[in-house]
């Protein structure tokens, strides 16, 4: 049995039958020592495989082969001229992932804790009628070629538990609410709506809810999925002429967890079905948990009736962790990997990688891999060498004076107001926001930031960061302003 054959068995456990048969089974992987070439038949297929399943393929090959490897993606079939793209190109997230030293046990990463419902295949609808009813994307799914069976939902991964979720000011409210609904589903915070940027822990929290609720009540019917899978489940129930079964499965859940709910916006047929599913569950006191990258009102194309229902319960944000929490995440991750990481190295990485937790862990993996390969300890010097491209990109992008200008323009004040001694609320709050942004987006120390804001003490900067972090949890207006400013500055 080849390494890829072993990988296929593991990958199959992580995906629905439809995903596996449609996307993974058709690709061919050629191994030449530590080089794995993934042949994807065409450019569209290659892009989709890389973006959607690249991390899964990488971690599975690492599990079966080891960490010392290179993966190339080709847009050609296995025979003929090869046009390849190495996934380690560039300094950002894909490169971090490629050098990961994390080895995931099959029992940890792929164990299924729910039994998906299987539908048997019947006649397909034609594309034109499906397109009229559902729209282009949904029609494409209905007419997609599949094998003989299809399952609802996605498996929960047992590695996602509350104990492995590092808590800080940026996520403690979301974590507390998640714990509450896992213990008493349908009683408080229904629905629980968790929003925040990519890679900040929303999926971790969501699956932790499912896993903990299973421990509290082993007989509970828990369905975890994401919006893409929910769409596939729905349109395939139409294609298989079994909508009643789809409705029975989803509407009989005790706890329904849907990740990235924003993607049902604009999918008219699916949105309508979800609306009725939501109502059925809510009226029966069943718990609904949703995640999104945006606050409900900001999801473009989402029906107003859904926005209204999302507001029935509790909406909480998950933001980028502060420096102390990022350090704690790195130290815990290193410990889980059985690696020793000096506190000063963890602090250096946390200071210089501030985009999201996923890239933070990727940077750690990169440092640990390099130190292990060179038989060195993961010192600051090793981290500096490994991450110099990341640091250069970040410093090139963000300067404190640029942050001050963007914030001043946003609040219609002058830059010199931010550096002045004025303490009026319309000046003090933007100043605190600008300081917090400077702390998050630059590698400057607290004293350096304080000096840039009129020679203020480093404790003033610390207070500003803590104040804004707390306000972002409780004040939607502040949170929205902060996210908009982050976007403007990072462009």
From Swiss-Prot:
GO terms for cellular component: cytoplasm; plasma membrane. One of its GO terms (biological process) is regulation of DNA replication. Coiled coil: none annotated. Keywords: ATP-binding, Cytoplasm, DNA replication, DNA-binding, Lipid-binding, Nucleotide-binding. Disulfide bonds: none annotated. CDD domains: AAA, Bac_DnaA_C. Plays an essential role in the initiation and regulation of chromosomal replication. ATP-DnaA binds to the origin of replication (oriC) to initiate formation of the DNA replication initiation complex once per cell cycle. Binds the DnaA box (a 9 base pair repeat at the origin) and separates the double-stranded (ds)DNA. Forms a right-handed helical filament on oriC DNA; dsDNA binds to the exterior of the filament while single-stranded (ss)DNA is stabiized in the filament's interior. This is Chromosomal replication initiator protein DnaA. The gene is dnaA.
